[in-house]
């Protein structure tokens, strides 16, 4: 489980990105790069990091399911992911 502080920081960044999304798009379309530098750093979507929905783990994230590889494996073994089964060849 990730630190609560890391998860809180991520949530705050998501809110900031959402808040400034329209303003950023407007400045980028106008080519006003100085204006972009005046926005908060966390307003940039590149500062966001995909995290597991259940554990908050930032590494080993499987985008299709929105969880880490570890949680994906556990859920697949429990049969909570329809259509997913253990590979055998």
From Swiss-Prot:
Record Gene3D superfamilies: 30s Ribosomal Protein S14, Chain N (4.10.830.10)
Q: Looking at the record's lineage, which domain of life comes first?
A: Bacteria
Whichever gene encodes this chain, its name is rpsN
Pfam families from the UniProt entry: Ribosomal_S14
One GO MF term: rRNA binding
Protein name from the UniProt record: Small ribosomal subunit protein uS14
Keyword rRNA-binding on entry: yes
Q: Which InterPro entries match?
A: Ribosomal_uS14, Ribosomal_uS14_bac/plastid, Ribosomal_uS14_CS, Ribosomal_uS14_sf
GO:BP terms for this protein? translation
Parts forming coiled coils: none
Cellular component per GO, a single term: cytoplasm
Tell me which species this is from.
Deinococcus radiodurans (strain ATCC 13939 / DSM 20539 / JCM 16871 / CCUG 27074 / LMG 4051 / NBRC 15346 / NCIMB 9279 / VKM B-1422 / R1)
- Describe the task this protein carries out: Binds 16S rRNA, required for the assembly of 30S particles and may also be responsible for determining the conformation of the 16S rRNA at the A site.
Spell out the subunit comment. Answer: Part of the 30S ribosomal subunit. Contacts proteins S3 and S10.
Q: Which family does it belong to?
A: Belongs to the universal ribosomal protein uS14 family.
Which SUPFAM superfamilies is this protein grouped with? Glucocorticoid receptor-like (DNA-binding domain)
The protein's UniProt keywords, in alphabetical order, are:
Ribonucleoprotein, Ribosomal protein, RNA-binding, rRNA-binding
């Amino acid at each position: 489980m990730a630190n609560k502080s890391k998860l809180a920081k991520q949530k705050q960044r998501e809110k900031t990105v959402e808040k400034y999304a329209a303003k950023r798009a407007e400045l980028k379309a106008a080519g006003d790069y100085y204006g972009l530098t005046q926005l908060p750093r966390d307003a940039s979507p590149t500062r966001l990091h995909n995290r597991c929905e259940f554990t908050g783990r930032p590494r080993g994230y499987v985008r299709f399911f929105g969880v880490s590889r570890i949680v994906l494996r556990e859920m697949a073994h429990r049969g909570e992911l329809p259509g997913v089964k253990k590979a055998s060849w």
